[in-house]
A protein has these predicted regions:
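ATP-binding/phosphotransfer module of carbohydrate and carboxylate kinases, centering on a glycine-rich
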Residues: 1-67, 128-129, 172, 177, ...
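Short glycine-aspartate micro-motif
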Residues: 15-19, 68-72, 134-138, 146
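Short, acidic, Ser/Thr-enriched surface-loop or helix-capping motifs
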Residues: 31, 81, 148
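Glycine-rich phosphate-binding loop and adjoining helix at the ATP-binding site
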Residues: 36-133, 250-261
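Glycine/GP-enriched mid-protein hinge/lid loop-to-helix segment characteristic of carbohydrate kinases
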Residues: 39-41, 48, 95-96, 102-209
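Short, active-site-adjacent cap segments at secondary-structure transitions
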Residues: 78-81, 119-122, 144-145, 154, ...
């Protein structure tokens, strides 16, 4: 007989979500249908963890507490996700060593789940059902990647692609190593000394010879890191996220040529490269998906 599509009823379960980013902190309440019901940006305060707990407690009052599965927290890495602790992410010093999971769990009486922000985005991308075998590549002030293979997030892959080495005697990185991909291919590193203010300025002047040179250079740098991963874990698709998505086609064609000419599996199926959908509040929706993915699978 014909198959019957099934879906979870949106109001059946909820998740509290916390998106910790270098640009600020956002909290929200989401339902299992992927709907953002409430969202608040929190101003900088002396004790941000207490402020987050207070904001979440306020959100919790609007729904049946028994239907709230937990608190999802996304943050830049490196992290100790198992113990809910933020370790020592660069340019994130105020959060170093913070047991954010335990503090929020104790304050609200709900389980809390910490996840690398790029891995959380990959879980959200998986929930769209577009692909179950992909890499999500985030490029902005840093670089991160997460891999979903056979529908499963590779949990032993921490997302720190930006701190893989592409030149053993290269530039000194904030992590203490030399030659990290991030020191060459993050947007600030790429544009340093170029005269372009940001990525948007660069792509809006894509006709400029210097802009074309930088786009070519970015593709070369990124391919050096990506090919190492693709040779180990081939994927069908790469999804781009971050500011790099603006005028993504300028980079995608260059990147496709670089990867296609060097990857071990060239000539098999070409790896497709797409931007992630332009989803408002993706960070907070991704943090909520960290919770839902613990209870429901694709």
């Amino acid at each position: 007989r014909s198959a019957t599509p099934l879906a979870l009823r949106p109001g059946s379960y909820y998740a509290l979500a916390v998106d910790l980013a270098r640009k600020g902190c956002t909290v929200g309440l989401c339902d299992i249908g992927g709907n953002l019901l409430q969202c608040r940006e929190l101003p900088e305060q002396s004790d941000m963890t207490d402020a987050i707990a207070g904001a979440l407690a306020s959100l919790l009052e609007s729904v049946d507490r028994r239907k709230v599965l937990g608190i999802g927290i996304s943050a830049p890495g490196p992290l100790d996700c198992e113990n809910g602790r933020i370790l020592n992410p660069p340019r994130f010093e105020r959060w170093h060593g913070m047991d954010i999971g335990k503090r929020l769990s104790d304050a609200l009486g709900l389980p809390a789940y910490l996840e690398h922000d790029v891995c959380a985005m990959a879980l959200h991308q998986r929930s769209t059902g577009q692909s179950l075998n992909f890499m999500l590549l985030f490029i902005d002030i840093g670089i991160g990647a997460a891999i979903v293979s056979g529908g499963e997030l590779l949990g032993n892959f921490t997302g720190e692609l930006g701190h893989t080495t592409i030149r053993f005697d290269g530039r000194l990185c904030e992590c203490g190593n030399r030659g990290c991909l991030e020191t060459y291919a993050s947007i600030p590193a790429l544009l340093e000394g170029s005269g372009f203010r940001d990525w948007f300025d660069l792509v809006n002047q894509a006709h400029d010879p210097e802009a074309r040179r930088l786009l070519d250079q970015e593709a070369v740098y990124l391919s050096a890191g990506l090919i190492n991963l693709l040779n180990l874990i081939p994927v069908d698709s790469i999804y781009l996220a971050g500011d790099i998505c603006c005028r993504h086609e300028l980079l995608v064609e260059r990147l496709r040529r670089e990867i296609g000419g060097k990857a071990l599996y060239r000539g098999r199926n070409e790896t497709r490269i797409f931007p992630v959908a332009d989803t408002p509040n993706m960070g907070i929706l991704s943090a909520a998906e960290v919770v839902f993915s613990r209870f429901f699978t694709v």
